[in-house]
Swiss-Prot record:
PANTHER family attached to this UniProt entry: GROWTH-REGULATED ALPHA PROTEIN, SMALL INDUCIBLE CYTOKINE A
Gene Ontology MF annotations: chemokine activity; growth factor activity
GO cellular component: extracellular space
Protein name: Growth-regulated alpha protein
Top-level taxon: Eukaryota
Keywords annotated in UniProt: Cytokine, Disulfide bond, Growth factor, Inflammatory response, Secreted, Signal
A GO biological-process term: inflammatory response
Functional description taken from the UniProt entry: Has chemotactic activity for neutrophils.
Family of the protein in this entry: Belongs to the intercrine alpha (chemokine CxC) family.
Signal peptide: 1-30
Location of the protein in the cell: Secreted
Matching CDD domains: Chemokine_CXC
Name of the encoding gene: CXCL1
Organism (species): Ovis aries (Sheep)
InterPro entries for this protein: Chemokine_b/g/d, Chemokine_CXC, Chemokine_CXC_CS, Chemokine_IL8-like_dom, CXC_Chemokine_domain, Interleukin_8-like_sf
């Protein structure tokens, strides 16, 4: 009579592999997540009416993007990228800086 192969070594190997995968997954879950590794603004507009804007966020150049990005959030919740070189956008940024320095 032929003897059946002992499944214990295979089962033990599979269990060890599963433990390693779970441990690696938990470690990766605690790692910080980078939002974007590229520029967010692919197209820009020259300006937008101030009464439609809720807030403005200016992101300086960095490792993620080599250009300054100006992102306006409208009252509707939509985000619009503004051209930082446009005269109207420069006025908006100056106004923001003046308000921040006066506070």
């Amino acid at each position: 009579m032929a003897r059946a192969a002992n499944p214990a070594p295979r089962l033990l190997g599979a269990a060890m592999l599963l433990l390693l995968l779970v441990a690696a997954g938990r470690r990766a879950a605690g790692a910080p997540v980078v939002n974007e590794l590229r520029c967010q603004c692919l197209q820009t507009v020259q300006g937008i009416h101030l009464k439609n804007m809720q807030s403005v966020k200016v992101t300086p150049p960095g490792p993620h993007c080599g250009q300054t990005e100006v992102i306006a959030t409208l009252k509707t919740g939509q985000e619009v990228c503004l051209n930082p070189a446009a005269p109207m956008v420069k006025k908006i940024i100056d106004k923001m800086l003046n308000q921040a320095s006066s506070n």
